[in-house]
Swiss-Prot record:
Chain residues that bind [4Fe-4S] cluster 2: 278, 282, 285
PROSITE patterns from the UniProt entry: RADICAL_SAM
Gene name of this polypeptide: lipA
Residues annotated to bind [4Fe-4S] cluster 1: 252, 257, 263, 493
Protein name, UniProt field: Lipoyl synthase, apicoplast
């Protein structure tokens, strides 16, 4: 295969694998030390180890080409390069180094290309500076900045830029923007912003780099409450103990949510179904990932129903990791859990915060008609930032379509989505995203501040003020959303029970009805996973 990397120089390696003619795949958009490849033939991820190897080879020389003496030295960048301990300057050794770090199981028999004559073996330029075919040139956007800022901060300071690495006028311009005209370490000082499409105001978030400064005072939250005097355990402690005993997972704990004490003591919990390992790698999320996670617990629906029936809560949010490895994305597992919870506690209000199920209509239908009360799917960010923030399989328009399908399959459902702010979006983009959600019949929207869970996730670009959140809330309400929750500490499931019930009560008041919900009815066939949606009945206001 011919791989095109978004590195400081156009790079491609031809893999003449046995069993077929050479194939080509290309990719761009380096993030978190890995490049995403996209083509009809191949969709693969470049490991961090290879990114560091290639960049260290380029950084070893001011000219971007390695001499024999430079090639013979050992490459030592810590455990990330443990699989490639030395590099030789001969073509065969270079091919072996690339192959072993890229895909150890692949057969990389040649790195010779058909575009230019083979350079002399005294340089590795034939690997690192190969010019791709003209047909693919427009797909490449080399950038020292984008690569450097995708690395952990300690490694950024050890990478040295040189004008010769990029070559040409465009390369010199990028070099000057990163390191200055004389050349210096990129690790010193503040990292420059990355403007997109010529706009100085449009920036993208970067892994390991936060430009927002210290957290403002409005992010201070109270610690979880202990038991009150005379009581054995607080509501928070009771939930925590029961969750541990049933071997269940909550997003409140996994994501280190700052609102856990307020939500749990307020009677709202968010459970994670389908395990704790995700098949996707969104750059804002700290949940562990794997292409082949363990199978879900077949008894999990029963465990959840048993737990919820015992808890002193009136609203439960059930979310999950993405399970692209399952034929239905886990929709059937979700639906059965909803049915069993409703059977065990009919008064329970259930919100399901789910993935896009890869856009599979039947999966959306299965869950939408399972008996849940709120169908939630988060669009997460604005259209421009989606490729930088979410996994490559998560598409902006696909998320909108899934929310619209859920409403079509069950018009009585409340649909809900959430937007994270502080990732470099503009106010116009936020308003456009709100409009897109409303145009697809989304009923409820929440807006909250993005907070980086660990240093391995995207940095915070800015802390949005409470006044700005209030402005977005007013705009969203004018658009016709049935309920809007907007604030720095608001999360998709933050105090969801209170928000949801408040919306119902306010809606009843507007229509001249009683201030309380009188009855919740459920008719569902648990065995077939089919049933009518929960309907709320309220009495007319007495004359």
């Amino acid at each position: 295969m011919a791989y095109f990397f978004d590195f400081p120089t156009d790079t491609w390696v031809e893999d003449a694998s046995p069993g077929g003619p050479p194939k080509r795949a290309f990719g761009h958009g380096l993030a978190a030390g890995s490049s995403h490849f996209a083509s009809p033939v191949s969709r693969r991820r470049l490991p961090t180890i290879t990114a560091l190897l290639l960049f260290s080879l380029l950084s070893a020389s001011q000219s971007g080409a390695l001499s024999v003496s430079q090639c013979s030295r050992r490459v030592s960048l810590g455990p990330l390069l443990s699989r490639v301990s030395s590099v030789s300057c001969t073509p065969s050794a270079a091919a072996s180094a690339l192959a072993s770090s890229l895909y150890p199981t692949d057969s990389l028999s040649s790195v010779e290309g058909s575009v230019a004559p083979r350079p002399p073996p005294s340089s590795l330029a034939f690997v690192l500076r190969r010019v791709p075919p003209a047909a693919y040139s427009s797909s490449l956007s080399p950038s020292v900045l984008r690569f450097k800022h995708s690395l952990p901060r300690p490694l950024q300071g050890s990478l040295v830029c040189a004008p010769g690495i990029l070559g040409g006028a465009a390369g010199s311009a990028r070099f000057a923007g990163c390191c200055g005209s004389q050349g210096r370490s990129c690790g010193s000082g503040k990292n420059p912003e990355l403007p997109l499409k010529g706009s100085k105001d449009e920036v993208i978030p970067r892994v390991g780099t936060s430009t927002a400064g210290p957290r403002p005072d409005w992010f201070h939250v109270p610690a979880p409450q202990a038991a009150s005097r005379g009581a054995e355990e607080s509501r928070y402690q009771q939930l925590q103990k029961q969750i541990r005993g049933l071997d269940l997972h909550t997003v409140c704990e996994e994501a280190k949510c700052p609102n856990i004490g307020e939500c749990w003591n307020g009677g709202t919990a968010t459970l994670i179904l389908l395990g704790d390992t995700c098949t996707r790698g969104c750059r804002f999320c700290a949940i562990k990932t794997s292409s082949k996670p363990p199978p879900p617990d077949p008894l999990e629906p029963e465990k959840v129903a048993d737990a919820v029936a015992k808890w002193d809560i009136d609203y439960v949010v059930m979310t999950s990791v993405d399970r692209d490895d399952m034929p239905d994305g886990g929709a059937g597992h979700f639906a059965r859990t909803v049915q069993l919870v409703k059977k065990a506690k009919p008064s329970m209000l259930i919100e399901c915060l789910v993935s896009d199920f890869q856009g599979m209509e039947e999966s959306v239908r299965t869950l939408a008609q399972s008996g849940l009360d709120v169908y939630a799917h988060n669009i997460e960010t604005v259209r421009r930032l989606t490729p930088y923030v979410r996994d490559k399989r998560a598409k902006y328009d696909q998320s909108l379509r899934v929310l619209h399908l859920a409403k079509q399959f069950n018009p009585s459902l409340f649909t809900k989505s959430s937007i994270m702010l502080g990732l470099g979006e503009t106010s116009e983009e936020v308003v456009r995203t709100l409009r897109d959600l409303r145009d697809h019949d989304v009923d409820v929207v929440t807006l909250g501040q993005y907070l980086r869970p660990t240093k391995q996730q995207l940095g915070v670009v800015e802390y949005v003020t409470p006044e700005t959140f209030k402005k977005y809330q007013d705009i969203a309400e004018e658009m016709g959303f049935k309920y809007v929750a907007s604030g720095p500490l608001v999360r998709s499931s933050y105090k969801a029970g209170e928000y949801y019930m408040k919306h119902l009560i306010d809606d009843a008041r507007k229509h001249g009805r009683r201030e309380t919900v009188k009855q919740v009815k459920l008719e569902a066939d648990v065995g077939t996973l089919k049933g009518t949606t929960t309907t709320f009945q309220v009495n007319e206001k007495e004359a």
